[in-house]
């Protein structure tokens, strides 16, 4: 509810820039805090040694996979809910909310069980070296306990956000993240748990977020979760697939990309793995604002598409891209200037810093391109353009990155590893532009058809 205006009226009639910023701010805060608690693990574990830092980076690829499951059900069910609320079909939205939530929780339990059974082979598959393996196993066996909480929390978070209730989602995510940051130094150093202490801090934070988000579904205009509304059907899972497969593709490929990066960097030692892990965390934190802005755009996009308000949808997209690009240009300039100090905060190792600075500066060069890439992916995903959304989701860390991480190091050595993401971003941007142009031309035709029917 926004100043006594219901969500439908607010999202389809209030000034676009005001709506997007209002929707985006809670999401940006959630993304930033989540990014900070990911960085907190790296920061505090970095005080142990380089191998511990590298181990967290290795397990991070598993976290991408678990997040992929949560985003699959969260975006899949949430995008459907958004369109159905925009079209005033509330009963469909209510059943989808519970179906998405319980399905994601069950998948998290399966990941937990299989991960614990195959702990050592999984650690090696993710890119762990013999010197890193003991740290990786200590960290991973605890992190897996949080899989059901993480998948279902991400589902609830995205469902609430796509209903236009991002403030409720923010409260749950932020509380868990802050608790994680507080617990990290206590469990790692005070209680002497080392790298497993960082994992316990993360799991406890995820469990708290889960409980709060579940309680938040009963507040405001949120759709409450009830097992009686759990209605699995082929049609509902088909809708979840259409809306969620781009997110699963994006996160799943991020998992494979991180594994591939660890393997490629591992050829140059543990310092290279640690450096690339640190750069990845910094990049993720930098993108938090742009992703949050894009997620603020999504409920506007879903409601407007469901209501047939194509001009408003186009205006919202343009605003999102311009603001996001402007922000990333500023980050690019600042990051270039302080890159050495930034890497040094996490690991005061000259070799790690030297590798990290080069990799970070390469990525900074193409940062501004990512606003259009991300917004276009969210546009296609929310408006049920699954194949385009999947292609765009696969581009940055799959279609281009994975082949490049094997090709570039073969020709340029360590520099090939460091420049890989930047080269992938250029190719992704080149692919995105014609796809988004075609999509808006399609919207123009759809608008004309709606007018003809009226």
Name each region found by the language model.
Residues 53-113, 150-169, 275-339, 370-389:
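Small-residue-rich hydrophobic transmembrane alpha-helices
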Residues 65-68, 180-185, 210-214, 285-288, ...:
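Hydrophobic transmembrane alpha-helices of multi-pass small-molecule transporters
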Residues 11-43, 47-48, 64-76, 80, ...:
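N-terminal transmembrane alpha-helices
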Residues 22-41, 142, 153, 176, ...:
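Transmembrane helical elements of multi-pass membrane transporters/channels
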Residues 74, 143-161, 169-177, 198-211, ...:
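Short runs within selected transmembrane alpha-helices of multi-pass transporters and secretion channels
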Residues 1-24, 81-148, 190-245, 301-366, ...:
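Short alpha-helical transmembrane segments in multi-pass integral membrane proteins
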Residues 32, 36-54, 123-130, 186-193, ...:
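Helix-terminus/linker motif at the lipid-water interface of multi-pass membrane proteins
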Residues 27, 31, 43, 60, ...:
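Transmembrane alpha-helix boundary and packing residues in multipass membrane permease domains
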């Amino acid at each position: 509810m926004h100043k006594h205006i219901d969500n439908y009226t607010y999202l389809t009639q209030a000034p676009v820039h005001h709506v997007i910023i209002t929707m985006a701010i809670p999401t940006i805060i959630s993304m930033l805090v989540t990014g900070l608690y990911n960085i907190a693990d790296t920061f505090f574990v970095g005080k142990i040694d380089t191998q511990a830092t590298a181990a967290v980076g290795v397990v991070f690829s598993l976290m991408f996979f678990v997040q992929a499951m949560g985003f699959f059900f969260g975006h899949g069910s949430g995008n459907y809910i958004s369109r159905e609320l925009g079209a005033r079909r509330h009963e469909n939205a209510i059943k989808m909310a519970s179906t998405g939530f319980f399905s994601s929780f069950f998948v998290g339990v399966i990941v937990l069980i299989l991960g614990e059974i195959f702990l050592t082979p999984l650690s090696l598959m993710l890119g762990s070296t013999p010197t890193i393996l003991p740290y990786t196993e200590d960290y991973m066996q605890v992190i897996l306990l949080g899989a059901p909480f993480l998948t279902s929390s991400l589902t609830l978070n995205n469902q609430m956000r796509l209903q236009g209730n991002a403030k409720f989602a923010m409260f749950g995510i932020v509380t868990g993240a802050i608790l994680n940051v507080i617990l990290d130094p206590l469990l790692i150093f005070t209680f002497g748990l080392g790298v497993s202490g960082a994992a316990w801090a993360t799991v406890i934070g995820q469990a708290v977020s889960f409980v709060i988000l579940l309680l938040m579904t009963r507040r405001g205009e949120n759709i409450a979760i009830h097992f009686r509304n759990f209605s699995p059907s082929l049609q509902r899972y088909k809708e979840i697939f259409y809306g969620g497969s781009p997110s699963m593709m994006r996160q799943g490929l991020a998992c494979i990309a991180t594994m591939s990066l660890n393997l490629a960097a591992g050829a140059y030692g543990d310092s290279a793995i640690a450096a690339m892990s640190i750069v990845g965390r910094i990049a993720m934190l930098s993108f938090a604002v742009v992703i949050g802005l894009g997620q603020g755009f999504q409920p506007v996009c879903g409601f407007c598409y469901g209501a047939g308000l194509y001009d408003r949808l186009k205006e919202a997209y343009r605003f999102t891209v311009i603001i996001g690009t402007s922000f990333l240009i500023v980050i690019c300039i600042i990051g270039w200037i302080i890159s050495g100090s930034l890497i040094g905060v996490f690991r005061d190792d000259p070799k790690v810093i030297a590798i990290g600075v080069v990799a970070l500066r390469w990525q900074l060069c193409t940062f501004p391109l990512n606003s259009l890439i991300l917004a276009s992916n969210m546009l296609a995903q929310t408006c049920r353009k699954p194949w385009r959304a999947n292609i765009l989701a696969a581009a940055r860390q799959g279609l281009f990155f994975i082949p490049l991480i094997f090709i570039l190091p073969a020709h340029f050595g360590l520099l090939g590893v460091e420049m890989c993401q930047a080269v992938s971003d250029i190719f992704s941007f080149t692919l995105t532009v014609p796809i988004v142009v075609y999509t808006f031309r399609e919207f123009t035709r759809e608008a004309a058809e709606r007018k003809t029917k009226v």
